[in-house]
Amino acid sequence: MTRSLIILPDDSSRPVLDAIHNAEKSVRVKMFAFSHQPLLDAVIAAHQRGVLVKVMLNPVRRDGETDNDGARDLLQQYGIEVTESSPSFDLTHEKSMVIDDEYAFVESLNWTDENFTETRDYAVVTPTAHEVLEIIECFEADWAREDFDPGESARLIW
């Protein structure tokens, strides 16, 4: 697999759904806004078939709006590990997903209905090991509430 580009709304949510449906070991999601029901269902189904699922959601917008309460409550109802993004930042606007520690999605799109049907957004899918590892390391540091320093050899823009 080489890097690929998903262009929304043309490509729809299908590539993201397919990745979650095909996950065998793990799914890590970090999302600013998550309310798209087909993706919620896919994440729940992955968990139910034994895939380790971890979801990190931005807790509140700058204006005080809480977009992710419904998603968090639903996912936790199914026993999925959900946490808020790192409190070191006022908000986390990152949108990413790592599947089976093998490939990562780096996205401009939130997982909301309009991002898959109305807005021009993008996702880059990378299987490049050092890029995937950087995303995993940042995710796990945020999850554990530890500092993340990608170092001078980082290949991604942090």
PLM region descriptions:
Residues M1-E24, K30-W158:
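HKD-type phospholipase D/PLD-like phosphodiesterase module
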